[in-house]
């Protein structure tokens, strides 16, 4: 087999592939035998008709096409290996010449993984946030714990106010007609939680147990149900019960009740450490994002359209999954946004291109710096996954048997970003 390679623009390669006549004849013979076992020739049992009759019945061209269906993919894989390229999409194949006892010549144009021209990626300046914890931040965490572990006291005689948990019956109407899904009995609602549409909770404030009131609201313009967006509605609300939080005093007893610590001072110190760790994590994430962004900006790479299109589909798939959690379909979202699917895909292209470039640059840096994933690191990661899902490690290994490359890549990616941060200049 002969293979010649021509490099085209935008990370595309054209392979001219010539398969010897002998190989074509072998493939033709194999295809003929397969067809001969199935074709029905009057006066002969299947597979027993003379060759000339079979070829006349189905046509040599048909047999040759069957042969090419097997010969083309086989020879293409060999040609790719011989040319030393890494395709990222299916090839565009065009036949040049072929015959039963002739060489097969065809061209295959395909997008390949592009070469990355790295720029500066070490010594990059990144901003390191100062990690300071104020007394106010600790007090805010204590206040959260007070509310979380507060006792609920029934208010027999008094008005509802923000922070109270109320039990209500409500029934909504729009244009005098019952609102689908707009009614409930014995519904628990914390006033100020903003669970309901704007204006609803505010109008419950001041109501007393046993009181019934009509509440007028307008659905937001961006409400997820398009038929309700921007429209007014009336809810008949009956307040059945008010429960008010009784906060425990901040003392050593409180610390014992809500934590493993014996004193309030110990609890405060622990909260301070946790806040500091959270800030450290946020600072680290921002440094990582900044150093990766700069390394990517400094690199040059011609990204083929197919890689961008694949990433658009990947982003779109995840977006559809997110919409499901919001009980929306992609079609409903597009109708609400007044967009077509093609318009949405076009909007996603810059993000997709950036994603692809980022991964290519990180991969190139890892290759240049010799960053790899060791067997020990892979085993350690599998152990973490097994612990997370409370499954035996061997079971996790079976599940990841076909995805070990992905797992190794995630480790290499993590190590590469760590390398960039460690070799950056924090300012």
Curated annotation (Swiss-Prot):
One of its GO terms (molecular function) is peptidyl-prolyl cis-trans isomerase activity. Gene3D superfamilies: 3.10.50.40, Trigger factor ribosome-binding domain, Trigger factor, C-terminal domain. Its main location: cytoplasm. It catalyses: [protein]-peptidylproline (omega=180) = [protein]-peptidylproline (omega=0). It is found in: Cytoplasm. It is an enzyme of class 5 (isomerase). SUPFAM superfamilies: FKBP-like, Triger factor/SurA peptide-binding domain-like, Trigger factor ribosome-binding domain. GO terms for biological process: 'de novo' cotranslational protein folding; cell division; chaperone-mediated protein folding; protein transport; protein unfolding. Disulfide bonds: none annotated. The keyword Glycoprotein does not apply. Its EC number is 5.2.1.8. InterPro entries: PPIase_dom_sf, PPIase_FKBP_dom, Trig_fac, Trigger_fac_C, Trigger_fac_C_sf, Trigger_fac_ribosome-bd_bac, Trigger_fac_ribosome-bd_sf, Trigger_fact/SurA_dom_sf. Residues 163-248 form the PPIase FKBP-type domain. Involved in protein export. Acts as a chaperone by maintaining the newly synthesized protein in an open conformation. Functions as a peptidyl-prolyl cis-trans isomerase. Consists of 3 domains; the N-terminus binds the ribosome, the middle domain has PPIase activity, while the C-terminus has intrinsic chaperone activity on its own. Belongs to the FKBP-type PPIase family. Tig subfamily. This is Trigger factor. It comes from Carboxydothermus hydrogenoformans (strain ATCC BAA-161 / DSM 6008 / Z-2901). The gene is tig.
